[in-house]
Amino acid sequence: MTTTRTERNFAGIGDVRIVYDVWTPDTAPQAVVVLAHGLGEHARRYDHVAQRLGAAGLVTYALDHRGHGRSGGKRVLVRDISEYTADFDTLVGIATREYPGCKRIVLGHSMGGGIVFAYGVERPDNYDLMVLSAPAVAAQDLVSPVVAVAAKLLGVVVPGLPVQELDFTAISRDPEVVQAYNTDPLVHHGRVPAGIGRALLQVGETMPRRAPALTAPLLVLHGTDDRLIPIEGSRRLVECVGSADVQLKEYPGLYHEVFNEPERNQVLDDVVAWLTERL
């Protein structure tokens, strides 16, 4: 089965140009996936994911978040999670109009997982299935209370202020993945800015209260050796959601990007199998 990728764009809030890709299989689609990538990266790092989904008969839509990759806006600059969820909602709307009647799957990794979670509790009628990979739903656990308070304040006043350095070697045990990430011109290699820190704290601090609104089937993927987003947040998430069909798939020894680990094919097979059972 052949999957074709096309690039498009739309005007997001504030008239920011949002670039997105669509991966279309050459057969009638079984469902539509709308994907949100993580902090600092871009949609095309998920080309192999979309190709695997395409082989299963799924159309995939994936945007470069504002301030990321090919999209417009100041680099990784945001003040509120709603800026991301609004763009994501626009893309879900496009996918829904272009494939009416198809089930909608929302998929997010890391920061994108936090975005998809926030979107899911706000718009529970806009999707049918949710898949989260190492979701950033407990950012408050990653910093001290003092740093959290500072990030929430600075995120409003100086949202572009770099506040947190990341260890990029922690994304994958595959050295080729790390090298490609470090040399990718579309990837932001700087520190996490205060605005994004504030946005993710918004998600994490409200997660236990808002998670019961998630009632659709949910699959959460997480490597047990993830040093960037520890697995404990995912374990708490699955205990809080309102869905009767929820599964946390823990991958022993895997790092942050389970889709880019040496075991990536098994992870993708697990995702496709889970989705296929529910379509």
From Swiss-Prot:
GO terms for cellular component: extracellular region; membrane; peptidoglycan-based cell wall; plasma membrane. Optimum temperature is 55 degrees Celsius. The activity increases 3-fold in a linear fashion from 25 to 50 degrees Celsius before decreasing slowly at higher temperatures. Changing residue 110 to A: Loss of lipase activity. It is found in: Secreted, Cell wall; Secreted. Its main location: secreted. Keywords: Cell wall, Hydrolase, Lipid degradation, Lipid metabolism, Pharmaceutical, Secreted, Virulence. It catalyses: a 1-acylglycerol + H2O = glycerol + a fatty acid + H(+); Hydrolyzes glycerol monoesters of long-chain fatty acids; 1-butyrylglycerol + H2O = butanoate + glycerol + H(+); 1-octanoylglycerol + H2O = octanoate + glycerol + H(+). The active site is at residues 110, 226, 256. It is an enzyme of class 3 (hydrolase). Inhibited by the serine esterase inhibitors PMSF (100%), E600 (80%) and THL (22%). Virtual screening identified a tautomer of ZINC13451138, known inhibitor for HIV-1 integrase, as a potential inhibitor. GO terms for molecular function: lipase activity; monoacylglycerol lipase activity. It comes from the Bacteria. Its EC number is 3.1.1.23. Pfam families: Hydrolase_4. InterPro entries: AB_hydrolase_1, AB_hydrolase_fold, Hydrolase_4, MAG_DAG_Lipase. Optimum pH is 9. Highly stable from pH 7.5 to 9.0. At lower pH values, the residual activity decreases rapidly to 50% at pH 6.5, and it is completely abolished after 1 hour of incubation at pH levels of 6.0 and below. Belongs to the AB hydrolase superfamily. Rv0183 represents a suitable and promising drug target. Involved in the hydrolysis of exogenous host lipids during chronic infection. Catalyzes the hydrolysis of both monoacylglycerols (MAG) and diacylglycerols (DAG), with a preference for MAG. It hydrolyzes 2-MAG, 1-3-MAG and MAG with short, medium and long chain fatty acids such as 1-monobutyroyl-rac-glycerol (MC4), 1-mono-octanoyl-rac-glycerol (MC8), 1-monodecanoyl-rac-glycerol (MC10), 1-monolauroyl-rac-glycerol (MC12), 1-monomyristoyl-rac-glycerol (MC14) and 1-mono-oleyl-rac-glycerol (MC18:1). Monomer. This is Monoacylglycerol lipase. It comes from Mycobacterium tuberculosis (strain ATCC 25618 / H37Rv). The lineage of its organism: Bacteria, Bacillati, Actinomycetota, Actinomycetes, Mycobacteriales.
